[in-house]
Structures are given as C-alpha cells and as structure tokens.
C-alpha cells in the first residue's frame, strides 16, 4: 500500500504552521533575560534596565533595548506605560533613573480623553520586563530600604544612657 501524497502535504503544512506560531511570540521570558545577564559588571552594584523612548508596545521596547549598564548615579529601572482604556498600548518608555523619579508611581488618567498612564519603578538587574497596567502593577518595588543611614545617633545615646543607669544601679 502506497502512502498518500495528500496526507504527507497535510502533515507538512501542519508542521510549518506550528513553527510559525512559535516564531511569532511577542513577549520575553525570564529565560531570555538570563542570556542578557553577564557575569561581570563595570562597577560594584552595576545593573541594567530595559531602555526605550516612546516605543509602540512592550515587545518593541524590550526587543530593541540597548544592552548597556545604567549610569552610576541611577539606582532604579523606570517604566511609563500609556494605554487606551481597552488596555492597548500607545506608548512605552523605560530607562534608568535616580530615586527622585520613582516617588510618583501609580496610574492616572491622561489629559487626552480615554488614555491612562501607569508608572512603575523597580530595583534589580533588568527588573522592568513587564508593563504596569493598573494600580496593582504600578508600584515602586525595592530590594533594599530607601532611607539608609549610617547609624542612629539617638538610639546609640539611649543605649549608652541605659547602660550608665544600669551600671550606676549595680555599683
């Protein structure tokens, strides 16, 4: 019995269609990011962010983002997402920023009717992969305390005073 050429063509077309579906994925995964993360940095604590200015959507931003380290005077990755009320992206901006630019995260309605702007910041290497789409996503996520001081002089004086009183009472 001879195999049918029609069946062979059907199987071949099915295989090609599956390959095309896989090739048109429009989102990055964490595995993709692993390949972008080198083992050395140009300075201690060096990090990267996805960077783009007014890209059409998240895919276009992340796809063409330059693979460079953020300047030393920055500490966070910033993302601003402008979208229609339906959720369709209008504009995506991502960059490295200092703390001051991360103090107003959240979502707000734009002056243009029907637009919503959500802003988020994060701390970490290439942490700004996803887009903020609502108040739950539009946050300021840090891995370390924002207000880091070199010490607490008031606490030290209280401890010393307590020790002085304790030593004075036990003598």
Swiss-Prot record:
The UPAR/Ly6 domain is sufficient for inhibiting alpha-3:beta-4 and alpha-7-dependent nAChR currents. Acts as a modulator of nicotinic acetylcholine receptors (nAChRs) function in the brain. Inhibits nicotine-induced Ca(2+) influx through nAChRs. In vitro, specifically inhibits alpha-3:beta-4 and alpha-7 nAChR currents in an allosteric manner. Acts as a positive regulator of Wnt/beta-catenin signaling. A motif (NxI motif) lies at residues 88-90. It is a lipid-anchor; GPI-anchor. This is Ly6/PLAUR domain-containing protein 6. Gene3D superfamilies: CD59. Interacts with nicotinic acetylcholine receptors (nAChRs) including CHRNA3, CHRNA4, CHRNA5, CHRNA6, CHRNA7, CHRNB2 and CHRNB4. Interacts (via NxI motif) with LRP6. InterPro entries: LYPD6-like (IPR039457), Snake_toxin-like_sf (IPR045860). One of its GO terms (cellular component) is neuron projection. PANTHER family: LY6/PLAUR DOMAIN-CONTAINING PROTEIN 6 (PTHR31171), LY6_PLAUR DOMAIN-CONTAINING PROTEIN 6 (PTHR31171:SF0). Disulfide bonds join 49-77, 52-61, 70-96, 102-121, 107-118, 122-127. SUPFAM superfamilies: Snake toxin-like (SSF57302). The lineage of its organism: Eukaryota, Metazoa, Chordata, Craniata, Vertebrata. GO terms for molecular function: acetylcholine receptor inhibitor activity; acetylcholine receptor regulator activity. Its main location: secreted. A lipid is attached at residue 147 (GPI-anchor amidated asparagine). Glycans are attached at residues 134, 147. Residues 1-25 form the signal peptide. Keywords: Cell membrane, Cell projection, Cytoplasm, Disulfide bond, Glycoprotein, GPI-anchor, Lipoprotein, Membrane, Secreted, Signal, Synapse, Synaptosome.
